[in-house]
Regions:
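Helix-to-loop junctions at the C-terminal end of transmembrane segments
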Residues: 50-64, 264-278, 369
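Helix-loop boundary and gating motifs at the non-cytosolic
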Residues: 1-45, 215-254
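C-terminal transmembrane helical hairpin of 12-TM major facilitator-type secondary transporters
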Residues: 279-327
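Cytoplasmic membrane-interface "Motif A"-like loop-to-helix N-cap segments
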Residues: 59-74, 275-289
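Hydrophobic core of transmembrane alpha-helices in multi-pass small-molecule transporters
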Residues: 79, 90-108, 307-325
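A membrane-interface helix-boundary motif in multi-pass transporters
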Residues: 31-33, 150-171, 367-385
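Juxtamembrane intracellular "pre-TM" segments in multi-pass secondary transporters
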Residues: 186-221, 411-419
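C-terminal ends and interior cores of transmembrane alpha-helices
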Residues: 70-89, 287-305
């Protein structure tokens, strides 16, 4: 249910409405808006990179994963509601609220992933991960339907009229969190070491243990590179759509189409990923990403001014397929490689890799788009996925799982001896 709840922030604040509102209304200058949005989004992700391993390690040692998940969610809800205060020209207020809101959201996403190994097995982890991802897209579809109907009935077609939707996003998140708060139990502690160590000691310890998981390191490097592209597309999807002439209510409908495609893909992944294999699944979706971004680049190079709107609608299906599949399959790899007693720490590193990728990718894409041009930015985006695919070919899933099992056996021996 938490995957369903936080879709309101993902869709309305990160992807769809707030980026356009910020660029066109709060800033009021397209070039400056692209630059400031990339700076704000990347800045928040850089801070998440610093916090992720600390939060993950502390949550593991104090057995407070649920508390961290709920706490970050509540903070994100409050800050999301405050976005209604961002009026025309007040871009600095928008950044002052969005940056901490995104930090809370991203830290919660990391913690949510750490629950995965405890509710699945190595055989079912792909399916369970995809089910959670699918719930998120179902929530997205319902929310977008509400927004589309509201925009149509109330005539809220222009970005200047979108501030009430930020309150709807906060309310949706708050209501959707209630089942998690009431019914999800704190996972049973598996790490009984003293909790008095400093944060620096925890990070050094986590890094020392990570060194024993070579395949996880290889995957994180690959994920880091193709994560540049995924995070960039999430942050700039609405802005790119607007560049192709998709605006107002049509922008909401485009996002609805993208979400339907992504949700359908997540359902397919939930059913077939464990059968097809995580490796084949990830390689397939990276191929879809490369084809989609390369097509956008070709269109921009051949039709630089006023490209046909229908082209972006068509390519949006490829983007939706990529979004729906690459996230859940990537999360499955981390769960597959993580020993159970260090899940929050290792998912913290996964989150750190993803957020650092987003920080670098969003910043570089936004600045290139603002100061060099759309074609150069799209070429950069295509390169992210291509290099990520090449690096992923070096990851050995079986070897990575054996590394996790060895770590679990060693931990059981140490725990049994009372060390």
């Amino acid at each position: 249910m938490y995957d369903l709840a936080n879709q309101s922030f993902t869709l309305l604040i990160i992807t769809l409405l707030f980026p356009i509102y910020f660029k066109d209304v709060a800033v009021g200058n397209p070039q400056k808006g692209d630059s400031l949005w990339s700076l704000g989004a990347s800045g928040s992700l850089f801070l998440v990179v610093l916090l992720s391993p600390i939060v993950g390690s502390v949550a593991d040692r104090h057995n407070k994963r649920k508390a961290v998940l709920v706490g970050t969610g509540v903070c994100c809800v409050i800050l999301t509601a405050l976005l209604v205060l961002v009026r025309p020209g007040a871009w600095w207020i928008g950044l002052a609220i969005f940056i901490p809101a995104n930090i809370m959201y991203q830290l919660g996403e990391n913690m949510l992933g750490s629950f995965l190994p405890g509710i699945s097995t190595p055989r079912t982890i792909g399916k369970i991960s995809a089910i959670g991802w699918t719930m998120g897209y179902i929530g997205g579809l319902l929310l977008l339907a509400v927004v589309a109907v509201g925009a149509f009935l109330l005539g809220w077609k222009d970005p200047e009229q979108w501030r009430p939707f930020f309150l709807i996003a906060a309310l949706w998140f708050a209501i959707g969190m209630i089942p998690t708060m009431l019914f999800v139990k704190e996972p049973v502690a598996t790490n009984h070491r003293a909790a008095s160590a400093s944060a620096g000691d925890r990070i050094r310890s986590a890094i020392a243990h990570l060194k024993n998981h070579k395949q996880l390191i290889r995957f994180l490097v690959s994920f880091f590179v193709y994560g540049f592209g995924v995070q960039t597309m999430i942050m700039f999807a609405a802005i790119l759509a607007a560049d192709f002439g998709i605006e107002g209510t049509r922008l909401i409908l485009f996002t609805l189409q993208l979400t339907v495609t992504a949700g359908g893909t997540a359902i397919v992944v939930a059913k077939y990923q464990d059968r097809l294999g995580i490796r084949a699944t990830i390689l397939s979706f990276l191929g879809v990403w490369i084809a989609s971004c390369a097509t956008l680049l070709i269109v921009k190079l051949t039709i630089p001014v006023d490209p046909p709107e229908w082209i972006f609608w068509a390519i949006g299906n490829g983007i939706g397929i990529g979004l729906g599949g690459i996230g859940t399959s990537s999360r499955s790899v981390v769960g597959f490689f993580a020993p159970k007693h260090r899940t929050a720490e290792f998912f913290g590193f996964w989150g750190m890799s993803y957020k650092l990728a987003g920080a670098i990718g969003v910043l570089s894409f936004g600045q290139v788009k603002a100061w060099v041009g759309d074609a150069a930015a799209l070429a950069l985006l295509t390169g992210f996925f291509a290099v990520g695919l090449v690096l992923f070919l070096r990851v050995d899933l079986r070897s990575g799982r054996r590394e996790a099992m060895r770590a679990e056996r060693a931990h059981r021996v140490i725990t049994h001896r009372g060390v």
